[in-house]
């Protein structure tokens, strides 16, 4: 959730938010810094075109990982240029391909949000803005808590991929998926 940002870690520690329940109580509350933090960070960065970038990031955070899936959900608009900027200019998303796919292939490419905080913010806060506007923080907390096992599993998976990459000694580290499913991480010596 913190994305490694010391300010966020300090806020959790200072407010005794050290368990999942306490963290969610702190994050999903009326005066929480986190409610508008993602928006404040990115609107300045994206400028007047922030809407399309927010829409793309929101879809990625919610499981639409391919360009085709995202374009379909967004009504068929072409987003190739926006994906390229999110990846290469803003460094917010990463392109992944199945571990055994041929290098350079675009088939089965998926996009993920590389920053844990922004991924969390888009998945739970921005996606559920209506709960916030109605000040229905209890239901928002329950929604996020119900998804904790799945969400934390994906974060842990990415952590292990990063750690294995830092160790070195592997030809590739990644996931394998076909059109709709993904399986466990594979690593090759």
Annotated model-derived regions:
Residues 1-43:
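Amphipathic alpha-helical "lid/sensor" segments that cap RecA-like P-loop NTPase cores
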Residues 3-7, 64, 86-91, 114:
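P-loop NTPase catalytic cores that bind/hydrolyze ATP
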Residues 24-27, 42, 46, 95-125:
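Short, cationic-aromatic polyanion-contact patches
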Residues 38, 45-52:
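N-terminal positioning helix adjacent to the helix-turn-helix/winged-helix DNA-binding module
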Residues 53-61, 161:
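Hydrophobic residues on short alpha-helical segments
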Residues 73-94:
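Short amphipathic alpha-helical interaction segments
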Residues 107-189:
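A cross-kingdom feature that marks ATP-driven nucleic-acid transaction machinery
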């Amino acid at each position: 959730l913190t994305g490694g940002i010391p300010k966020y870690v300090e806020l959790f520690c200072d407010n005794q938010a050290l368990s999942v329940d306490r963290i969610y109580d702190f994050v999903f509350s009326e005066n929480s810094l986190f409610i508008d933090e993602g928006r404040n960070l990115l609107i300045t960065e994206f400028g007047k075109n922030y809407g399309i970038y927010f829409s793309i990031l929101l879809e990625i955070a919610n499981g639409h990982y391919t360009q085709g899936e995202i374009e379909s959900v967004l009504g068929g608009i072409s987003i190739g240029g926006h994906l390229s900027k999110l990846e290469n200019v803003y460094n917010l998303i990463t392109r992944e391909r199945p571990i055994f796919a041929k290098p350079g292939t675009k088939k089965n490419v998926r996009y993920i949000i590389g920053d844990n905080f922004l991924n969390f913010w888009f998945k739970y806060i921005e996606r559920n803005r209506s709960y916030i506007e109605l000040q229905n923080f209890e239901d928002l907390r329950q929604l996020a808590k119900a998804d904790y096992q799945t969400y934390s599993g994906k974060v842990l998976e990415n952590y292990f991929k990063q750690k294995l990459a830092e160790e070195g000694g592997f030809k590739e580290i990644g996931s394998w998926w076909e059109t709709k499913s993904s399986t466990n991480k594979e690593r090759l010596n």
